[in-house]
């Protein structure tokens, strides 16, 4: 299987999000990279499903709450920016203050 660097990055991100989901299911609080991976994966998969940029910007804030992450993580993540592929092209989705 031959993947472009972009495809490799997406695959790594998807796997990181899956690891984060497993840890979250075990009751563990997520660290910074895990939280970012989970939010990013939510946006990428939502774009693939045909959701709009506005929908993803709003729903990206509902993926994780303060109780889901380690102390200090919400303050470390001011924005998550994801370049996602939509049916009508690639767009930048910014989720402001994703952990509330």
From Swiss-Prot:
Organism superkingdom: Bacteria
Protein name as it appears in the record: Urease subunit gamma
Signal peptide extent: none
UniProt catalytic activity: urea + 2 H2O + H(+) = hydrogencarbonate + 2 NH4(+)
Gene Ontology cellular component list: cytoplasm
Similarity remark: Belongs to the urease gamma subunit family.
Keywords carried by this UniProt record: Cytoplasm, Hydrolase
GO BP annotation list: urea catabolic process
Quaternary data: Heterotrimer of UreA (gamma), UreB (beta) and UreC (alpha) subunits. Three heterotrimers associate to form the active enzyme.
Annotated pathway: Nitrogen metabolism; urea degradation; CO(2) and NH(3) from urea (urease route): step 1/1
Pfam family, one: Urease_gamma
Primary location: cytoplasm
């Amino acid at each position: 299987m031959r993947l472009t660097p972009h495809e490799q990055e997406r695959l790594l991100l998807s796997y990181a999000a899956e690891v984060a989901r497993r840890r979250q299911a075990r009751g563990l609080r997520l660290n910074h990279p895990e939280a970012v991976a989970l939010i990013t994966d939510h946006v990428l998969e939502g774009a693939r499903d045909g959701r709009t940029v506005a929908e993803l910007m709003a729903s990206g804030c509902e993926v994780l709450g303060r109780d889901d992450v380690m102390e200090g993580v919400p303050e470390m993540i001011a924005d998550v920016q994801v370049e996602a592929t939509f049916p009508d092209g690639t767009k930048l989705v910014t989720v402001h203050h994703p952990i509330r």
